Amino acid sequence: MSAREPRIVAFLCEACAYAAADDAGRARYVHPQAPLTLRVACAGRVEPGLVVQALREGADGVLVGGCHPGDCRFVDGNLRAASRMTLLTRALEQAGVEPARVRVEWIGANEGERFARIVTEMVEELRALPTVPPRAPQRLPARLPSGGGEGRKEEGAGGGERSAAGTRPRIAFYWNASCGGCEEAVIDLGEALPRLMAQAEVVLWPAAIDAKRAEIEALPDGAIDVAFVNGAVRLDEQADGARLLRRKSRRVVAFGACAQLGGIVGLGDLDGPEAILDAAYGPDVPSVSNPGAPGPSPGDSLPLPALLPRTLPLDRVVPVDAVVPGCPPSTPIVERALAALLSDAPPGGGAVLAPDASLCETCPLRESRPERPALHALRRLATEAPEPGRCFLAQGIACSGPATRQGCQPGCVEAGMPCRGCFGPVSGAGDLGAAMVGAFGSLTTGDGPERTRLAAALPDPAGTFWRYGWAAGMPARPRRGGR
């Protein structure tokens, strides 16, 4: 039960729903509270990313008000809005966000009484739901509750100058919650790797050399020139390690999709840490319930790192100077990134070291892509093979290429698989998953019910469009139990 009045953000078409809100005010129609109203040119201009942002910033609910079907001055903007919000609501529901928090309604310009009734109904529904907490801090606190260890500075490195002239720069490679693919991306440099080793001193690389935490702690603050950190932050121990490297390094680089966006690891937030532990160590797991398995031995106990409440991209824990995207980053991207970061004028400010252009521009299937693909039916790779040499979107197969950065060369498409967005969004796209929900929802065809049916037929919108970016983009409301 909500402890306060629900906060509603209302995106209202200026030609109809916004005019209805004015009409409700002039006629003094009573409703529990006035929502925060935002006038838009058309309901079809309401990007799903704006709805996600409103929920992430603490709104209890979002209302999208558009013209009745057939009345849209942009022909089908209202129907596009309904299709998009159907996809978005289903993705949010996968994470435990109640469908009642997002509502699409058709409201005519002279329907002030209807507007007041809709707001009243929405407020009453939201009152029965848990209160949305204020937005969580952008980064973790300087000390984690289960942390300990040395004192930490909140921001940036602790000082130190670049390695003296004539000495090799010091670099570090470190991993958090990852699969090992980013380590392979460095190995895949091939002949360039020995040259790198000759030009730089590697002080930390768990996959290749033995180094202890105490050795890194003993270094002066800022002694490492560049620290490349891959993997999402999933454990309190990983957050502590990221803070240590931030203090000891002049520059910290988020290396790979998991460090940049949370990666596939972030999809664990759909269920939450309790469900993850239960699936791995619960009483129904064969290796746990095996009567013949050896039991605990008496002696000293060793505490295990704790799972954080949710998965975090690296920049939610420490400031990041640059990003090398990809799952894994491609060899040309890694080569150029290393050269730039070890140069006399390294990039900073969180720069993403990959071309800022859509993958579609270099896609080998681009010649077969219609100017505006139309989605008449959904096709799935699990049930039928795609047509070789033809744009995936034109075939009704979900593909994230339109909103994804170039840089992958593009390996998946050349192997007959659609893009899943591992290189992250192009500038301006914001949340890649929300951008693709907007794009994919807009491609649906037919009347209102047919468009909604097509949008609802996609089996897994969260895993399809937020495969790599769920942790970075979606509201922090993980479930407490299983799905």
Q: What do these predicted regions represent?
A:
Residues G266-L267:
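Active-site-proximal loop->helix
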Residues G70, R234-L235, A259-L261:
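Glycine-rich nucleotide phosphate-binding loop and flanking beta-alpha elements
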